[in-house]
Curated annotation (Swiss-Prot):
Keywords linked to the UniProt accession: ATP-binding, Cell cycle, Cell division, Cell shape, Cell wall biogenesis/degradation, Cytoplasm, Ligase, Nucleotide-binding, Peptidoglycan synthesis
Protein name: UDP-N-acetylmuramate--L-alanine ligase
GO cellular component labels: cytoplasm
Xref: CDD domains: SIMIBI
Amino acid sequence: MINAKKEFQQRVRNMIPGMRRVHQIHFVGIGGAGMGGIAEVLLNEGYAVTGSDIAESAVTNRLISLGAKIHFSHAASNVDNASVVVVSSAIKADNVEVVAAHEKRIPVIQRAQMLAEIMRFRHGIAVAGTHGKTTTTAMISMIYAQAGLDPTFVNGGLVKSAGTNAHLGCSRYLIAEADESDASFLHLQPMVSVVTNIEPDHMDTYHGDFDEMKRTYVNFLHNLPFYGLSVMCADDPVLLELIPQVGRPVITYGFSEEADYRIENYEQTGFQGHYSVITPAGERIDVLLNVPGKHNALNATAALAVAKEEGIENEAILAALADFQGAGRRFDQLGSFIRPNGKVMLVDDYGHHPTEVNVTIQAARKGWENKRIVMIFQPHRYSRTRDLFDDFVRVLSQVDLLIMLDVYPAGESPIAGADSRSLCRSIRNLGQVDPILVTDTAELPEIMDRVLQDGDLVLAQGAGNVSKLSRQLVELWTKA
């Protein structure tokens, strides 16, 4: 087994040149999904990987099982033997390990710079956009795997069919989620770029200027070679505005009549989608998609367009989409449970922007007709709550019962008027739903049992620790 692993690593090394004089790579904040995925690929390439984080997680446990040495505290000594230090956007410049690395003249680079280095000698496919990039990255990865191309992939969330968010393949293909939150996707030099949509988010990075954000996306697309390909959603008005500025080959997809890959006759049956795609050549492809919602049909059609343009056969594309198990925390069905007032279903979803929350609600309505939608919502970041306050009020008013948790700060300080109590007040004033504010999560199980009814669909929604709370409910309800 060890010899087989070394043989595989050598084959990859023979195909992809290594990083000169880099032996040990240290990740500060290694437990983040994006960081952990890159670390896993580098471990499998044969590099020594160390890291630090403040708490154990499924990501850190997996990396340790693969051979990484991880410290669960930050200390200057953690970087002693590092050739390079990789940091996520959440790590501040005054972090003790970052300071120590600078003092020792050890290079300190962003996560995306390391991803760009992995991509440098590969055929890179980068997926960017405000919404849908994790799922789209997973779909493209599974199509390429189904076609026997054994791609390397690095995703921001779990690719459930593969059981991991990163994989080192033995082909020239690398499929990666591109992170616009800190504009670090500008480091990437792919052959194919997908942009799913653009909406205001992470506006602190762009100095509150949406035009600056749009210019940054155009610059990202300019990183393509002149013979590269940009795949863009024709349903997004911002992308339509930007297409004339791209200056590279562009293929579009969407429900729009103008789309090159056009979706027709979408229907949802339960939690599956059925529709047709008309290709630029006029071919009609009938798709069965194993995840719900029109937003996922868009994600899947982006993946289909990439695959078709790269010469992958329909059989592999359709098989991968029909069997697609989803991405972690993207409408993740955790099971059905018997509660005091009847049977309920629990779904965990990462969506934390009003647009994402809205499409999740719509998909749930289609798949769970005539049933109540009960949402446990945890706002993520005070700044996002402030910037999108009215949109959150409008979208969250669509559910039948809303249980609101405190804002997950993600390192931010509170902002007056951008808290959960203010959200609840404004939602209540609309008169469509009367939110229940839960400030002590220890009370959540008792509250749930009091308010749930037979047949309810419970959506645990948000990017903070609401997922952990949903898993605690699963554990508690399984024992009951």
